Amino acid sequence: MKKAILATKIGMTQIFNADGVLVPVTVLEAGPCVVTQIKTVENDGYSAVQVGFGDKKEKVVEKDANGKKSVAHRHGVNKAQMGHFKKAGVSGKRFVREFKFENADEYNLADEIKADIFAEGDKVDVTAISKGKGFQGAIKRLGQHRGPMAHGSKFHRHQGSNGACSSPSKVFKGKGMPGHMGSVKVTTQNLEVVRVDADKNLLLIKGAVPGAKKALITVKETTKSGK
């Protein structure tokens, strides 16, 4: 892998391509990311680049004359994390991820990675946490068929048989049943980069991208190149 970046999802829109065809796209605010650590084979056993994305204030704990503590930015970057960022010469970051770049030795601490690492026509893999749907039935969750909708039907959206009752007298593992849906890590592969706005750090990717608005998105060059 040579190219990757962290982004947040803005939403969907549609644009016309050069042939006048209307194309649905997802708009991502990609970067700028900064290099917070460079891992080497000698020190860490493998080669990788750690990047940070999105500013986050430092958590500050102060004491008054009576020794009572007051906390500013309670959910901010703690002292240990801030030391890590200061060592790299960057401000506190909200998200930190690691990429195993093939050209990791070409990066330096505090280098910026922007949206222009990608170009129009590039194929990318996009990873995010999907939207949570809560507890759902087998029809919505797994696409099972519903029952007859006639007046005399005993069930409509009820799940079908779970298995024989006398033998084996149990429900096998992996049986599709109602349960929690969504809020899982999802990767959509081989999506096309339709447009890159380097000035505004925007990537326009063809089609839908998993995750809600403002969700953290990981964009990498595809592993299915040429397919």
UniProtKB/Swiss-Prot annotation:
Region (Disordered): 146-167
Keywords: Ribonucleoprotein, Ribosomal protein, RNA-binding, rRNA-binding
InterPro entries for this protein: Ribosomal_uL3, Ribosomal_uL3_bac/org-type, Ribosomal_uL3_CS, Transl_B-barrel_sf
Coiled coil stretches, renumbered: none
A single GO cellular-component term on record: cytosolic large ribosomal subunit
HAMAP family (alphabetical): Ribosomal_uL3_B
Protein name: Large ribosomal subunit protein uL3
Native source species: Agathobacter rectalis (strain ATCC 33656 / DSM 3377 / JCM 17463 / KCTC 5835 / VPI 0990) (Eubacterium rectale)
Encoding gene, per UniProt annotation: rplC
